[in-house]
């Protein structure tokens, strides 16, 4: 999301591993509200590309630490264990609370328009539609749009339907069909 070519597995850094400004960071500096929704861990490569700067996409604990101090107004997805079951024993949920986030680690609840909102509700990723996920993607998207609307500012929202890609890699046509239909809601 930087617009610059880099090396395989890099997140938000140049070929020389120098941090590059992401589109989310650029828009935030211009007064936009920002949001990320993912069916996988919020520290996974696609969402991380919008706020993190690391040499390797599997540096989930470092990516979570960067998210805890990033300027993201609304986030929803999985990855709970990278915030509270860390090798360094840091509690990044406390960091989010200290930064005035409305935080829910159990469910997608109602956002609060006067706060930043974080819904990190699974240890890793959410289940696929074929595994019974329900309407998380639709509900998270609607909640984010409601939040942004209440604040009446321009916004940037990245919504990732992770399982469309994963279903393709697995050659699982049923998963892909259900995930595309879910994303289309």
Model-predicted regions and their roles:
Residues 4-7, 34, 40-44, 80-84, ...:
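Solvent-exposed loop/turn segments at secondary-structure junctions
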Residues 1-63, 72:
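Active-site nucleophile/metal-coordination loop of metallo-enzymes that catalyze phosphate/sulfate
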Residues 51-78, 97-106:
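Acidic, His- and aromatic-enriched active-site or binding-groove loops in soluble protein domains
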Residues 45-50, 123-132, 150-185:
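Active-site His/acidic residue clusters
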Residues 29-35, 70-74, 99-102, 114-116, ...:
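Loop/turn elements at helix/coil->beta-strand transitions in domains of secreted/extracellular proteins
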Residues 106-120, 140-162:
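Active-site regions of oxyanion-processing enzymes, predominantly non-cytosolic
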Residues 16-23, 59-63, 68, 72, ...:
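Stable alpha-helical elements in mature extracytoplasmic
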Residues 75-128, 133-134:
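Long, well-ordered, tryptophan-enriched scaffold segments
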């Amino acid at each position: 999301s930087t617009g610059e070519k880099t090396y395989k597995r890099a997140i938000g850094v140049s070929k020389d591993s120098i941090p590059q400004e992401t589109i989310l960071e650029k828009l935030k500096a211009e007064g936009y509200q920002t949001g990320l929704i993912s069916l996988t861990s919020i520290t996974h490569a696609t969402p991380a590309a919008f706020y993190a700067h690391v040499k390797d996409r599997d540096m989930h604990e470092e990516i979570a630490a960067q998210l805890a101090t990033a300027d993201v107004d609304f986030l929803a997805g999985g990855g709970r264990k990278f915030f509270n079951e860390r090798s360094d024993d840091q509690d990044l949920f406390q960091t989010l609370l200290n930064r005035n986030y409305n935080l829910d680690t159990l469910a997608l609840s109602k956002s609060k328009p006067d706060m930043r909102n974080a819904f990190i509700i699974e240890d890793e990723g959410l289940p696929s539609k074929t595994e019974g996920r329900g309407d998380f993607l639709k509900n998270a998207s609607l909640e984010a749009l409601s939040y942004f609307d209440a604040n009446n500012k321009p916004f940037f929202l990245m919504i990732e339907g992770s399982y469309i890609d994963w279903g393709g890699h697995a050659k699982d046509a049923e998963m892909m069909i259900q995930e595309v239909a879910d994303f289309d809601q």
